[in-house]
């Protein structure tokens, strides 16, 4: 069991190279509002979609050869292009709608056909208004957990 105390953390960790974990590290770093350096040898198209999405939330991302730097910036855009990444869509949908009053999500390839009814229904119960049940859609009202 890991116990986390409420205090400022700093230092370096060696993280497993995993696309799934890369999404999580990038999103958590963006939400922390702290300067973060994440070592990634390869950036997949799915992870690139998450990087683009957090830029829309007002995060500056500097991509280097084997790492990325994430730091706070200003909100730039409320349109989230998840490309073909289901992970980006599932992670960013509740995050973006809890931070923004209105936003739009789009996707490509098979992503618009992938099921997300569970997330959409939960968000609708929280007063989010969706223009469609499948991508692309606009969402009004903040998601309140």
What do the PLM-derived regions correspond to, one by one?
Residues 1-145:
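Structural preference for solvent-exposed beta-strand-turn elements
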């Amino acid at each position: 069991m890991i116990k986390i105390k409420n205090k400022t953390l700093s230092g370096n960790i060696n993280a497993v190279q995993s696309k799934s974990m890369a999404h999580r590290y990038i999103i958590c770093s963006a939400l922390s509002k702290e300067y973060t350096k994440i070592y990634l040898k390869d950036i997949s198209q799915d992870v690139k979609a998450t990087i683009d999405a957090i830029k829309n939330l007002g995060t500056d991302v500097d991509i280097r050869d084997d790492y990325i730097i994430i730091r706070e910036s200003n909100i730039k855009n409320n349109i989230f292009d998840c490309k073909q990444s289901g992970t980006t869509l599932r992670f960013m949908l509740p995050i973006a709608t809890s931070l923004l009053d209105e936003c739009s999500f789009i996707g490509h390839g098979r992503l618009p056909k992938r099921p997300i009814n569970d997330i959409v229904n939960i968000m609708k119960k929280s007063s989010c208004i969706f223009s469609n049940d499948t991508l692309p859609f606009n969402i009004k009202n903040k998601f309140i957990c």
